[in-house]
């Protein structure tokens, strides 16, 4: 009996999750960080293996997902962004160290600051998944791989359950699921699973505060994306009808179309068709430069940024250069230990695991595009952004996908779609740069990023952070050449600006803050006063002065001629508005002054009374026999009140959803030294 008792205790101890402190990462252990002069740019970090909660009865293997979290050390932010790279099978450390994380790895295998890091806007959580991606492992003797997105989704939900137990404060933050390329599949599946979990959870405090999803250059609709390759290549001049391979391309396009049209809607369909996958291969073959004087590294078009060239058959796998530094960084002595990993239990890091790709064939799951209408109809905020130079997941395919979507009572972008130009403002040089264009309709926002690749955060990091600013509504709205322009900036902290958020794109809920509500009530009060004074004739003098001033101006303009009627009623209306605002400002200052005087007077009167009044004491209770009140209390918070304990658990976190602009006048796949690790180029 005693044996079983101690065995049970041992089992419970072994199942216990590590503490938050055990996941802490010391910056001094990471090469390069000690050389950074501005220590405020170094984030607070947590990393390590997170055991997955075993909710799936068919999956008894213990799985550990590797995560790396970054947050600002100087400020508590109320938003958590979970970033996933795609592949499938590509590590999210691409995102952390090559794209939108706080650091990049230089050629000396040291960390340097990434000026466009997203962690200045929200806490960033990078997770390697599915199992056997990056540093995420299973303890089974034989390696097991996820074969369907439904299982991948369940595993990630198990990760979240464990993660929020270790980091409970994060569960109450606004949650955004983000990723790029093949993560266009992961992200909607996860969003749907979270919404389902919330619907089945009666306790509001146990729900996850999912607010939106961000997908960059997403592979969401395989059929539509495949059919967009040839039209996109033609529109960009990458190929023309005089190309000797053009007839072959047309036949390949027809095969793909016929395959899609002929499918039986009553039967389960393949996740994607081989006939459609082959179109991209045919385009690369047709555009290959085989002339003798062409350098070997310029033979093939880079599918991730079509304005660049690469060797064949790499066609982009040797790009970007920074990714080649990451394996060497993780191989440095002490790095794994600094990230709370046991070197004996993790494989050598490689960017993408092709085995994960081979196994995740999705024989049951449907493409994530079918999840989008329900997610949008639920009110979830959805942002899709695309680098315009990407061929693999090009913007033509994404826009065609949106045109087919039915949500919010309409199909695709409607006549009410708002269109904006988008500029990035560098305050250091006081210059604006064209960043792209924005389309917004209902709760869907599409952002085209100017001159950016498949990996927008890599080559346009500051622009990519603007995508987060647009979601958070930390933007300016200006008018330029008669068009509305959204402006994002280089500033680390947008709270430095008086940016009252009203939700110009409807991205945020547009709820005013308490201060804004009070100001609105005061404005209404002033308006009522003005109306009352106007009716009683109290403002006649002001009106008379305005009339006299206007008459004098007309006299000056019309000297030597007859009086003319007002030719610009708009200017007259603007002048009336300015007069009204001045009067309102006067009333507001007067009202505030009265409130301040009354408050100070009440305080002084209270002090005077307290000082000159004798203290009272209870006459019905003998003080010597009085018992402590707490002995008779039946609720715990009574003692807390008596001892002055504060019930506000986290006052430092900002309120969410208060946002509006000021008016101022997959990739997942990055290059690898091993060609066969690029899932997109498998058939090459």
Curated annotation (Swiss-Prot):
The active site is at 181, 390, 454. Residues 1-16 form the signal peptide. Residues 650-671 have a biased composition (Polar residues). Residues 610-684 are cytoplasmic. Disulfide bonds: none annotated. Its EC number is 3.4.16.6. GO terms for molecular function: serine-type carboxypeptidase activity. Residues 514-547, 674-684 have a biased composition (Acidic residues). Residues 554-578 have a biased composition (Basic and acidic residues). It comes from the Eukaryota. GO terms for biological process: apoptotic process; proteolysis. It is a single-pass type I membrane protein. Keywords: Apoptosis, Carboxypeptidase, Glycoprotein, Golgi apparatus, Hydrolase, Membrane, Protease, Signal, Transmembrane, Transmembrane helix. InterPro entries: AB_hydrolase_fold (IPR029058), Peptidase_S10 (IPR001563), Ser_caboxypep_his_AS (IPR033124). Protease with a carboxypeptidase B-like function involved in the C-terminal processing of the lysine and arginine residues from protein precursors. Promotes cell fusion and is involved in the programmed cell death. Belongs to the peptidase S10 family. This is Pheromone-processing carboxypeptidase KEX1. It comes from Zygosaccharomyces rouxii (strain ATCC 2623 / CBS 732 / NBRC 1130 / NCYC 568 / NRRL Y-229). The gene is KEX1.
């Amino acid at each position: 009996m005693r044996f079983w008792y101690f065995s049970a205790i041992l089992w419970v101890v072994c199942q216990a999750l590590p503490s938050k402190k055990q996941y802490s990462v010391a910056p001094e252990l990471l090469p390069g960080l000690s050389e950074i002069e501005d220590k405020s740019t170094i984030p607070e970090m947590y990393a390590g293996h997170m055991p997955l909660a075993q909710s799936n009865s068919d999956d008894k293997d213990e799985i550990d997902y590797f995560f790396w979290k970054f947050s600002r050390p100087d400020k508590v932010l109320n938003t958590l962004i979970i970033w996933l790279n795609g592949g499938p099978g590509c590590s999210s450390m691409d995102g952390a160290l090559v794209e939108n994380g706080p650091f990049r790895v230089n050629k000396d295998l040291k960390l340097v600051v990434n000026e466009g890091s997203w962690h200045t806007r929200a806490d960033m959580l990078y997770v390697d998944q599915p199992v056997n991606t990056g540093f995420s492992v299973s303890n089974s003797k034989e390696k097991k791989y996820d074969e369907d997105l439904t299982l991948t989704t369940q595993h990630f939900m198990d990760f979240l359950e464990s993660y929020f137990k270790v980091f409970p404060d994060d569960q109450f933050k606004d949650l955004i699921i983000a990723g790029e390329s093949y993560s266009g599949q992961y992200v909607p599946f996860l969003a749907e699973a979270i919404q389902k979990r919330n619907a089945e959870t009666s306790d509001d405090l146990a729900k996850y505060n999912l607010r939106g999803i961000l997908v960059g250059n997403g592979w969401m609709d395989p059929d539509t994306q495949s059919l967009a390759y040839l039209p996109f290549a033609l529109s960009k001049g990458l190929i023309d009808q005089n190309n000797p391979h053009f007839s072959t391309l047309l036949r390949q396009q027809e095969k793909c179309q016929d395959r899609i049209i002929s499918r039986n809607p009553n039967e389960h369909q393949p996740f994607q068709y081989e006939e459609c996958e082959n179109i991209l291969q045919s385009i690369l073959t047709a555009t290959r430069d085989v002339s003798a004087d062409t350098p070997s590294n310029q033979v093939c078009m880079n599918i991730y940024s079509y304005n660049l060239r690469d060797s064949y058959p790499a066609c982009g796998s040797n790009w970007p250069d920074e990714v080649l530094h990451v394996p060497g960084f993780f191989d440095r002595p002490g790095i794994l230990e600094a990230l709370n990993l046991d070197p004996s239990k993790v494989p050598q890091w490689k960017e993408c695991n092709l085995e994960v790709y081979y196994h995740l064939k999705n024989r049951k799951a449907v493409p994530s595009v079918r999840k989008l209408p329900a997610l949008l109809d639920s009110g979830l905020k959805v942002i899709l952004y695309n680098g315009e130079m990407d061929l693999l997941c090009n913007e033509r395919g994404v826009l065609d996908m949106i045109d087919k979507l039915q949500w919010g009572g309409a199909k695709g972008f409607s006549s009410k779609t708002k269109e904006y130009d988008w500029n990035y403002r560098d305050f250091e040089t006081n210059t604006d740069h064209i960043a792209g264009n924005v389309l917004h309709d209902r709760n869907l926002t599409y952002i085209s990023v100017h001159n950016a690749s498949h990996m927008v955060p890599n080559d346009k990091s500051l622009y990519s952070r603007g995508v987060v600013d647009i979601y958070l509504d930390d933007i300016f709205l200006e008018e330029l050449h008669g068009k509305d322009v959204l402006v994002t900036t280089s500033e680390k902290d947008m709270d430095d600006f008086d940016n009252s958020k009203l939700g110009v794109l409807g991205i945020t809920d547009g709820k005013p803050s308490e201060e804004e509500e009070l100001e609105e009530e005061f404005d209404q009060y002033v308006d009522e006063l003005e109306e009352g004074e106007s009716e009683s004739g109290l403002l006649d003098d002001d009106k008379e002065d305005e009339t006299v001033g206007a008459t004098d101006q007309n006299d000056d303009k019309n000297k030597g001629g007859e009086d003319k009627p007002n030719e610009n009623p708009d200017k007259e209306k603007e002048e009336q508005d300015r007069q009204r605002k001045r009067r309102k400002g006067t009333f507001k200052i007067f009202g505030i002054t009265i409130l301040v005087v009354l408050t100070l007077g009440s305080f002084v009167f209270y002090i005077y009374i307290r000082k000159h009044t004798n203290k009272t004491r209870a006459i019905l209770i003998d003080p010597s026999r009085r018992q402590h009140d707490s002995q008779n209390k039946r609720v715990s918070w009574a003692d807390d009140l008596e001892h002055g304990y504060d019930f506000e658990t986290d006052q430092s976190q900002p309120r969410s959803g208060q946002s509006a602009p000021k008016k101022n006048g997959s990739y997942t796949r990055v290059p690898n030294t091993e060609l066969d690790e690029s899932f997109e180029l498998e058939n090459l």
